[in-house]
C-alpha cells in the first residue's frame, strides 16, 4: 500500500513538472509571436507612404482612410 502511495506521489510530481515546462514554452511562444507582430506593425508604419495616392476603398491605404486619395 505504501509503495502505491509513493508511486502516486511521484506520478503527481512528474505531471506537475511537465505542466510547468509546457506552460513556460507556451508563454515563450506567445512572447515570440507578439514581438513578431509588433515588429511587422512597426515596419508597415515605417514603409507606409501612400499619402495622396488615388484610391477607391479604404483598405487600399495604409491608414485605411480614403476620400478619392489616401489621407
Curated annotation (Swiss-Prot):
It comes from the Eukaryota. One of its GO terms (molecular function) is toxin activity. It is found in: Secreted. Residues 1-19 form the signal peptide. This is Conotoxin PnMEKL-032. Residues 20-46 form a propeptide. Pfam families: Conotoxin (PF02950). Coiled coil: none annotated. The keyword Coiled coil does not apply. Disulfide bonds join 48-62, 55-66, 61-70. It comes from Conus pennaceus (Feathered cone). Expressed by the venom duct. Its main location: secreted. Keywords: Cleavage on pair of basic residues, Disulfide bond, Knottin, Neurotoxin, Secreted, Signal, Toxin. Belongs to the conotoxin O2 superfamily. The presence of a 'disulfide through disulfide knot' structurally defines this protein as a knottin. GO terms for cellular component: extracellular region. Transmembrane segments: none annotated.
Amino acid at each position: 500500500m505504501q509503495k502505491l502511495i509513493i508511486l502516486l506521489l511521484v506520478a503527481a510530481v512528474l505531471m506537475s513538472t511537465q505542466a510547468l515546462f509546457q506552460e513556460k514554452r507556451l508563454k515563450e511562444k506567445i512572447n515570440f509571436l507578439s514581438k513578431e507582430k509588433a515588429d511587422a506593425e512597426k515596419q508597415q508604419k515605417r514603409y507606409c507612404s501612400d499619402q495622396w495616392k488615388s484610391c477607391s476603398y479604404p483598405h487600399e491605404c495604409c491608414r485605411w482612410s480614403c476620400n478619392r486619395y489616401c489621407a
